[in-house]
Amino acid sequence: MEFRTEHDSMGEVKVPADKYWAAQTQRSSENFRIGVGIETMPREIVHAFGILKKAAALANAELRPEKMTAEKLDALTKAADEVISGQLIEHFPLVVWQTGSGTQSNMNANEVIANRGNEIAGKKLLHPNDDVNMSQSSNDTFPTAMHISAVLAIEDKLIPAVDTLIATFKRLEAENEGIVKSGRTHLQDATPIKFSQEISGWRSSLERDRELLTLALGPLYGLALGGTAVGTGLNAPRGFDELVAAKVAAITGKTFVTSPNKFHALTSKDEIVFAHGAVKALACDMMKIANDVRWLASGPRDGLGEIRIPENEPGSSIMPGKVNPTQCEAVTMVAVQVMGNDTAVSMAASQGNFELNVFMPVCAYNFLQSVRLLAEAIVSFDKNCASGIVADKDKMYHNLHNSLMLVTALNPYIGYENAAKTAKKAYKEGISLKQACVELGFLTEEKFDEVFHPELMV
């Protein structure tokens, strides 16, 4: 491997000749050999750094034209665009487990954009600190990257995934409107319910989760950029914060604004905690929905067997013909991971000492993993399971009419205690509710048939 020599305030460092990073990134890659190649800084954060560096350059060009010249701006924004597009992702090797402020990742972005920009310009034009990092600090850029990446992940990936599954459940509701089945509480038989009503509960849960996600986006639109080192805005020109937020909004098409209090923006991560809470709520509902589906699909002969789900792959290496609810299991595992991540996000967010939180990389890593996993799990569940759910009408009818809880319909006619006696007799002797009720002398056969209609109990 060939190397070139780069330098920083600590001296010279050898860097791979074919990489755009420079001295500080190289030092970090050597000093933090933790999760190398596996737990690298999320691509979403790198993408966000490209956006904010471009936005900062555009703002500086207006507020400091003598420093951010047209020539520098052209080279810098072209290089930043390549970061945004993902073309330069191989030049961002740093792991999550580094400085808690994300300083090395900020410098990674500065160095890559500077060196690539210089290559575009054909001369040494850009300096990573003086130009790419102009009017900024790692302390305000990393919180900004966190918010940009969080908004893009939720708006562009998670919410669309939820919308798709909501649409699937709406279709299933319409297709199964007339089917009545046993309801269940405490995993025990309960009074009847329409299958469409059961599905509507799933759909409504997702609609509420969508509302919560949308609500959580509001605080995330506030950006720390312009607060610089401790929130005072030192070395940033007046008006930079509002202008750079407007530039980020223009680049992304999202309604980003400057945070009203930069001291809060640098040290507190309450917006991230709040948003992850909404993500966790969605994970909880997906856990419930996936569990419902796999219970209803259990069988085929010894379980509930009230629905059929798509057969995507062989279910067992030893039992031929077995079909497992694998998509449901994947969703529930993702839900567990998201719930665990919520603890990590909460703990990390609580570590804001004085003017800066120094657990930001782990906070961002877990937040973005939650959103990414949940969005992809929902898409997979919708495509490979939910969209192919088919009701087994015969099994639903059999289970419904074999349920002792239908006795509830007799309460107005024979009273609660007599209804309980009827159910217990039917269960103990293995006979129908009708036979038990008639033998106990509570109703005649004719009267029982007149008042007992499970389909009308919904």
Regions found by a protein language model. Name each.
Residues 1-458:
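Conserved, well-structured ligand/cofactor-binding cores
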